[in-house]
Amino acid sequence: MAGVLIALLAIVVAEALLRRYVWRRPTDLRAVAASLVDALVRRGGDLLGLSMLAPLPAFAFAHRLATIRMESAAAWGVLYLLVEFAYYWHHRLTHRVRWFWASHSVHHSSNELVLASAVRLGWTGRLGGAVAFFTPLVWLGFPPQAVSGLVAAGLFWQFWLHADWMPRLGPLEWVLNTPAHHRVHHASNPEYLDCNYGSSLIVFDRLFGSFVALRDDIEIRYGLTTPVLSHNPVRIAFNEWLALARDVRAARGWRARVRVMFGPP
C-alpha cells in the first residue's frame, strides 16, 4: 500500500507541475502542498491503527450469517453492487449530517479541482468510522478482504474523477460516475449542492433523486460555500470541527445541541 500511495502522490505532483508550467493553467501549488501533507499525516495515523471501529469487521465476520465464497462472477457482481450502495448512503450522509460533514468537508475545502483534491481527506474520518457502513456486508458472509478490496477499487476510480481536464464519456455518463459528474459534486454553486454521491456508479443517484447533470451555462465554483483560504493543513483539517464546537456551545439545551451535531450542515 505504501508503494501505491507514493505512486499516487507522484502523479499528483506531476499533474500540478504540468498544469502550472506546461498547460499554463492557474494552479495553487500551496494548496497542492497542503493536500500532500494531509495525505502523509493520515497515512501515519493508518499505520498507528487510529480507528475506533477497526475491530468491527472481524467481529462481524466471526458471527456472520453465512459463508459466501467468492468463486463466481455472480458473487463478485452482487458484492460490487452492495458496496456501491453502501458507499452511496455513507457519502450522502457525510453531506447531510454535520458530525460526518466535519470530517468530509476537508475533502471539499480545496478551491480548485485537481488530483491533489483526491488525497485531501482529513485526519478524523476514521474516528467517525465509515467502516460501519460496510460491516453489514461482512456480517452477511462476504469476506472482509473482498469488501475492502472493492472499496479500495472504487476509491482508485474516484482518484481520476478529480482531473478537471478529462472529457465527458458519452453514453457511459448514464451509468458511471465520471469526471463531469464529479465536477458537479465538488461545486459550491447553489444549483450543484449535495448531489452525485456515487463511487464508480451514478445509478443510485439517479434512483434516489440526487443526480444533477453538468450544465454548460453555469461557471463552476469549487470549494466550500464559505471558502477556506488557509494553506495550513491543521487549520484545514479542523476548520469545520471548530465551527461545530462553537455552534454546539452556543446552542441552548441538550436537544438543540443534538440537532446542531446531527442535523444538516
Predicted segments — roles?
Residues 28-40, 109:
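Membrane-interface segments at loop-to-transmembrane junctions
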Residues 41-49, 70-222, 227:
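Membrane-embedded catalytic scaffold of the fatty acid hydroxylase/desaturase
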Residues 1-9:
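Hydrophobic transmembrane alpha-helical segments in integral membrane proteins
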Residues 14-33:
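Membrane-interface helix-loop junction between the first two transmembrane segments
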Residues 218-265:
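Cytosolic-facing loops and C-terminal tails of multi-pass membrane proteins
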Residues 25-29, 65-72, 106-107:
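Helix-boundary and loop/linker segments of multi-pass membrane transporters
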Residues 52-77:
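Juxtamembrane/interfacial segments at transmembrane-helix boundaries in multi-pass membrane proteins
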Residues 16, 42-58, 231-234:
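Alpha-helical membrane-anchoring segments
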